[in-house]
Amino acid sequence: MKNVAIVGDGGHGKVIRELINARSDTRLAAVLDDKFKTFEGGKEWYTGPPKAVTELRRLIPDVLFLIAVGNNSVRKQLAERLGLGKDDFITLIHPSAIVSKSAVIGEGTVIMAGAIIQADARIGAHCIINTGAVAEHDNQISDYVHLSPRATLSGAVSVQEGAHVGTGASVIPQIIIGAWSIVGAGSAVIRSIPDRVTAAGAPARIISSIQTSNKG
């Protein structure tokens, strides 16, 4: 049984908790969030601020971590701030997800219920492949990406670091979604999208630039 600590106790964290409970090989060991000011042991799991990582590892040496925060930029900041190595993070896949044996999934990534990851897809670290999302064959998905529920990437799509593909959006084959860009919900992407823009509509068009650095 793998002991899992999640960092983040918002709505996304609730879903991660249920995913952990849905698996037969994981148990929730701790919830770390800034709203907890002190490190304490509860009836079922420990709670504390993110800085309690060191104390938690002393008590549970084999504990593995997952950053349960939906915001891509904040997730990157936490991954860098916690001072943990790649082997300290767990990859969580819901039992109902379908993942090709040839797919490669990075550390700290979560694959939610009903998601589909097809042949030779490559998914980076600390990504969220949300409920019912589809990453088709030969997709290249970089670190800190979020595919929202029912987002669909056709074959050989590339999604660069920190990009967010909105709920129900669809992307045709061989498109590139630029780093830290946002694709609006329900959009149909038929042309590649550059870095740090918001695109929406069917077909998707650039509607604004994103000025923040998102470098963590």
Swiss-Prot record:
Expression induction or repression: Repressed by SinR.
UniProt name for this protein: UDP-N-acetylbacillosamine N-acetyltransferase
Domain of life: Bacteria
Presence of the UniProt keyword Ligase in the record: no
Disruption phenotype: Insertion mutant shows decreased efficiency of biofilm formation. Disruption affects swarming motility.
Listed NCBIfam families: NeuD_NnaD (TIGR03570)
Cited function: Catalyzes the conversion of UDP-2,4,6-trideoxy-2-acetamido-4-amino glucose to UDP-2,4,6-trideoxy-2,4-diacetamido glucose, commonly known as UDP-N,N'-diacetylbacillosamine (UDP-diNAcBac).
Gene: epsM
Protein EC: 2.3.1.203
Gene3D superfamilies reported for this sequence: 3.40.50.20, Hexapeptide repeat proteins
Leader sequence segment: none
Disulfide-bonded cysteines: none
